[in-house]
Every structure is written in structure tokens, then in C-alpha cells.
Amino acid sequence: MSMSSAHPPSMAGAFPANATTHADGILLTAISSERTHLRANSGPHTSAAGAVPVDVYVDFHSGPCQRFEAAVGSTLDEMFGAGDITLAYHPVAVLDALSTTRYSSRAAASSGCASDGGRFREYVRALFAHQPPEYSAGLTNDELVEIGAKVGLTDSAFAECVRTEHYEEWTTWVTVRAGDRGVNWWPTVHVAAEPVRANAEAIRAAVSGAASAEADQAW
């Protein structure tokens, strides 16, 4: 499917819940407390105003992205839970050639369905935990529905959204927008709109630097 980078999908229901300003990603609003380093009784947590923006570009069929999630995901969740950052994920689909069923596109589209169901971050973790081998058929849509059920996405609307690939066009838009921004490697991490190395130490340092710069400007 081709799409002009100047024109996002215009059909009704084209964007998932909590889409970013340009509808090219998902902005987290909360993460279940049992999956972060927050106190067990703290409940869902949202980022504070003035937090440093962090953008993460991933393909759900990318081995490096899976390793990034395993190594850095908890750090991102911790900083988000503390209110230090806002966190946006941009699920691109550039590795469809690594499966026989367009798995990258289908997985990315299904993450939009998870955002509608209020369990986006939990579903992202589960997708990476169940990542199929490269050059395989990938997971079926029914298997994606089953993964969603494991993180609390049991509503029939989620299942229908995944099985009909409702957010296929949105996935294309996210991928086009990433290319327009010069993103050509996955994972890619931007802190305050600047690219940084995709490891916990570099991200923490960049967030600290951006927060200090903002504080200096406030004076």
C-alpha cells in the first residue's frame, strides 16, 4: 500500500486510542502498577507535566527490538512511572519480508487494537516475549488474540480488531512517518526529539540532560 507522507488515514476510526499528535504512534497514559517498579498499591500511574519526551521506534519482528525490550523496557517503565518521561511507541512495519504472512504489519496493527483496549504497553511486552523466528510464517491473528487475552484484552472488540487487521492503514502511516523523520534502524530512541543510543545508560543520561536544560531555561 502506498501513502503520501502528507496525508494520514482519513477514514472513520483510523487511529487507535491515545494516538500521538500526528497519529504516528501511541502515547502511553498509564501502565499497570504490578508491571512497573511502583508500589503495589499505587494503581495506574501517568507521567507528570513537564516530563521529558521519549519516542521509541520498534518493529515487532526485529530481534534487536526484542533484545532492547528485554534490556531496557523496565527502565523506560520505571522512568515513566516516576513521571520523569512521557513515552510514545511508534510500531513500524519494515520487516514483512522476514515472514510469509506480513507479520510485522499485522503485529503492529494489533498493537493499535491493544491501545483501544487500554493495555498497549502490556501487549507490547507480550508480543516481544512471543516473537516468532525470522523467516517463519509468524503468529496467526488468532494467536495474537490469545496473547492479548493473557494481558487482559478479553473483550470481543479486541479480537475483531485484530482479526480484521483494522489498523493496517494506520501501520503504513506510522512507517511512512518514521521514514520521513530519518528513522532507518530499529530500535531507534529519541529523547527530546534527539536520537540517542538504545541502551538504558544513554537514555537515562539524555533524559537527565534534557531535564536540566529545561530547568535552566526556566530560570
Label each PLM-derived region with a short phrase.
Residues M3-A17, A149-W219:
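C-terminal cap of thioredoxin/glutaredoxin-like
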Residues V58, P91-A93, L127, V162, ...:
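A mature extracytoplasmic/lumenal domain signature
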Residues C65, A97-L98, A137, R197-N199:
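Extracytoplasmic/secreted cell-surface and envelope-processing proteins
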Residues R67, A71-T75, S105-A109, R119-E122, ...:
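Extracytoplasmic/secreted proteins, especially bacterial periplasmic and envelope-associated proteins
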Residues E78-D116, F120-E146:
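Structural microenvironment flanking redox-active thiols in thiol-disulfide oxidoreductases
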